[in-house]
Amino acid sequence: MIVVDTNILIHALVDSPRTPVVRRLWLEDPAWRLPGLWRWEFTNVLWLKVKTGGMQKVEALKLMSLAASRYDPLERPLYMEDALRTALDFSISGYDGAFVGLARLLGTKLVTEDKKLRKAVGSLACTAEEFLSEN
């Protein structure tokens, strides 16, 4: 079981250079867990892709529906106080605090592509490659 952030979710569904390793991650450990915040961040990423011309509106809507059907069951509750406490403990954003806080609560790692976040939280986070090489 791992917690993954929105970047990992996007790479799982939208073809990119990172997609193959993220799909290997899913095959290796499909017990992904997510805070409810993932939906808002995912929506914002799709909105930005449409706004900048990187994706058509109809494709974004289909991806949102696919993401909801795939990822909603993986969502786990996290009290906002825990997200805030985590954010304050590590001097990270409240958004990042939700993902890191859930990983702390579940006693697992956050898999993220965010280098700055990984540096801030140390051993609580890793890249997909690091996770795959450890397991």
What are these regions (language model features)?
Residues 1-37, 49-61, 134-135:
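Short, well-structured N-terminal submotif of metal-dependent ribonuclease cores
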Residues 8-9, 38, 99, 116-117:
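Alpha-helix capping/helix-boundary segments
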Residues 43-71, 82:
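Active-site-proximal, substrate-binding regions of enzyme catalytic domains
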Residues 11-13, 45, 120-121:
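Residues that scaffold the ATP/ADP-binding catalytic core of kinase and kinase-like folds
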Residues 41-44, 101:
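Short amphipathic alpha-helical face segments that pack within enzyme cores
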Residues 70-113:
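Active-site neighborhoods of divalent-metal-dependent phosphate/nucleic-acid chemistry enzymes
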Residues 21, 41, 82, 119-120:
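Phosphate- and divalent-cation-binding pockets in alpha/beta enzyme and binding domains
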Residues 1, 92, 100-135:
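Acidic, PIN/NYN-like endoribonuclease modules and their adjacent C-terminal/linker elements
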